[in-house]
From Swiss-Prot:
Protein name (record): Probable carboxypeptidase AFUA_6G06800
EC top class, as a word: hydrolase
Main localization (coarse): secreted
Co-factor: note: Binds 2 Zn(2+) ions per subunit.
One BP annotation, GO: proteolysis
Subcellular location: Secreted
Keyword Secreted attached: yes
Residues reported in the UniProt entry to bind Zn(2+) 1: D165, E198
Signal sequence coordinates: 1-16
GO terms for MF: metal ion binding; peptidase activity
Any GO CC annotation of this UniProt entry: extracellular region
EC number in record: 3.4.17.-
Length: 440
C-alpha cells in the first residue's frame, strides 16, 4: 500500500457516516507486543496452530517468499500454482513486453473459463477480488509471537514483511472465494493479484490496458480491493500529487558567496510556501479541504543540494507528496505552480516538475451492512484500475482488508490470527452481497 494514513475494529458494528481520515491513531501497540513476547510457549506449538489451518499455512508460505517490487516472480508462481491446484484457470499476464518475469495473476474457476471471451455471459466473472503481491523493502522473515499470559490462539501475532500489506488480503480473498465456490460453484468470481502496486501501479495499469482481460463494456459489476483497513469498509481515500521542486545556481567558494548563486537559497522560499499549502485557505492560494477527508496534507520527503559546506551550491531539489482532500490533481498542479511563481517572483532558476501521475480523491462504496466505515489517507490501486462503463450502470468498488496501515511498511509489520480469519468472513459478506444484487 502506498504510504500515509485504527487494530481490529468490530465488523459487527453497523454502518455509520464516515469520519475524516486525518488524524487516525493506532488502536494497539504492536511494537511492544513483538518486542516483549517471551518464550514460555514453544515455537513448535505456534507452528502447530499454523500447520493445522490451510489459511494460515498459505499466508505463511506466501509471506516467506520475498517479493519486493520488481522481484515478484517467485511469489506469483506460488499463488498461481496454488490456484491451479484448487480448480482455477490461471492466466499469467506479463506486465512488460521485454520479459515475462513479472506478471499479474488473473484466475477464474475452471468451470467458467469457456465464458471468458463472452463479456455479456452470465457465467463470465462479474465480481473481481484484487490485491497486490509486491511489498516494500526490506524483506523481513515470517515469525510468530504470543504473549506469555495469553493462551488464545486467535491472538497469536504473525509478523514479517507483507503479512499486512497486502499478503493478508491476498490470502483472505482466496479463501473467501474458495468458501463461496464450495457452496455456490457457479458464482461468477474472478481473482486478480498484481505486481508493482508499491511503485506506481504498473501491474494494475497493464491489466487495465488489456482488451482481453478488461473488455468493453466491463464484465465486472463489483470490484473488491484488498488493503489493510482494520476490517472496516473504506468510504474513500485521498488523492495524490507528486512532484519535484528544483533549482539551479552557480558554484563558488563559500568565502566569496557573491561570486556564485546559491540554488539552496533560491529553493528555500518555494519549499516553505509549498509546505504550507494545506494550511492556507483556498481563497488565499492554498489547497482545498473537505468534510469527508479533512485537510490536504503536504510532505516534503526528500531534499538534496550542494556538494560541500564550503561551496556555494549550484543545484538543489526536493521531492514532494501531496495527499488531496478535494479537487482534481490538475487543479492542485495550478495551485502549486502559482504558489512557487508568486513566492519566488517568477525566478526562472526555480522550476516544478510534475513527473508523476496524479489523481483526485477516490470515493468508494459502503452499502453492505455490518461493517464499520472509515476513510484513509494512503493511496491504493483503485485509481489505476480503469474499467469500461457498463450499460446497466456504475461498477461498485469496495476497499477492505485485515491489519492496520500504521505498521504496514515498518519493521513491526504484523497482524493477528483473529484479524486474518475475520477478513475471510468479511470478504465472503461482500461477495455474497454482490451475488444477491446480481440475482435480484
Amino acid at each position: 500500500m502506498k504510504p500515509l494514513t485504527s487494530l481490529l475494529l468490530s465488523a459487527a458494528l453497523s454502518a455509520a457516516a464516515p469520519h475524516p481520515a486525518s488524524p487516525q491513531a493506532p488502536l494497539a501497540d504492536i511494537p511492544s507486543i513483538v518486542g516483549e513476547t517471551r518464550t514460555e510457549f514453544s515455537q513448535n506449538s505456534l507452528d502447530d496452530v499454523v500447520n493445522a489451518s490451510p489459511l494460515l499455512s498459505f499466508h505463511r508460505d506466501l509471506v516467506s517468499i520475498e517479493s519486493i517490487s520488481g522481484n515478484e516472480g517467485a511469489a506469483g508462481a506460488f499463488v498461481a500454482d496454488f490456484l491451479a491446484s484448487h480448480n482455477f484457470t490461471v492466466i499469467k499476464q506479463p506486465v512488460t513486453t521485454e520479459s515475462d518475469a513479472r506478471f499479474n495473476i488473473f484466475a477464474i474457476p475452471e468451470s467458467q473459463y469457456h465464458s471468458l471471451d463472452e463479456s455479456h455471459s452470465s457465467h463470465s466473472p462479474q465480481i473481481l477480488l484484487t490485491s497486490h503481491i509486491d511489498t516494500v523493502p526490506p524483506f523481513i522473515p515470517y515469525s510468530l509471537h504470543r504473549d506469555a499470559n495469553d493462551t488464545d490462539d486467535r491472538n497469536i501475532l504473525i509478523a514479517g514483511r507483507g503479512t499486512v500489506d497486502a499478503k493478508g488480503s491476498v490470502a483472505a480473498q482466496i479463501f473467501a472465494a474458495l468458501d463461496i465456490l464450495a457452496a455456490q460453484p457457479s458464482a461468477p468470481l474472478g481473482l486478480l493479484f498484481v505486481v508493482g502496486e508499491e511503485t506506481g501501479g504498473d501491474g494494475m495499469k497493464a491489466f487495465s490496458q488489456s482488451t482481453h482481460l478488461n473488455p468493453s463494456p466491463s464484465r465486472f459489476h463489483t470490484v473488491i480491493f484488498g488493503e489493510p483497513t482494520e476490517l472496516a469498509l473504506v468510504a474513500g481515500h485521498k488523492g495524490m500529487l507528486g512532484f519535484e521542486v528544483a533549482a539551479h545556481g552557480h558554484a563558488a567558494h563559500s568565502g566569496y558567496p557573491w561570486l556564485g548563486e546559491s540554488a539552496i537559497s533560491a529553493i528555500l522560499p518555494a519549499l516553505a510556501r509549498v509546505d504550507q499549502l494545506g494550511d492556507i485557505p483556498v481563497e488565499e492560494g492554498g489547497l482545498p479541504a473537505s468534510d469527508k477527508y479533512g485537510r490536504t496534507t503536504v510532505n516534503i520527503g526528500r531534499m538534496e543540494g550542494g556538494v560541500a559546506t564550503n561551496v556555494v551550491p549550484s543545484k538543489a531539489r526536493a521531492g514532494v507528496a501531496v495527499r488531496l482532500a478535494a479537487g482534481t490533481h490538475d487543479e492542485a498542479r495550478e495551485v502549486v505552480l502559482k504558489a512557487v511563481r508568486d513566492v519566488t517572483g517568477g525566478d526562472d532558476r526555480v522550476v516544478v516538475n510534475f513527473s508523476l501521475e496524479g489523481y483526485g480523491p477516490q470515493d468508494l462504496d459502503t452499502d453492505v451492512p455490518g461493517f464499520n466505515i472509515t476513510t484513509v489517507n494512503y493511496g491504493t490501486d483503485v485509481p489505476n484500475l480503469q474499467l469500461h462503463p457498463r450499460p446497466d450502470g456504475k461498477v461498485r468498488r469496495y476497499l477492505y482488508g485485515p491489519g492496520t496501515i500504521h505498521v504496514a511498511h515498518g519493521d513491526n509489520e504484523a497482524l493477528t490470527v483473529a484479524q486474518l480469519e475475520e477478513a475471510v468472513r468479511g470478504y465472503k459478506k461482500l461477495i455474497q452481497a454482490a451475488l444477491d444484487r446480481s440475482a435480484s
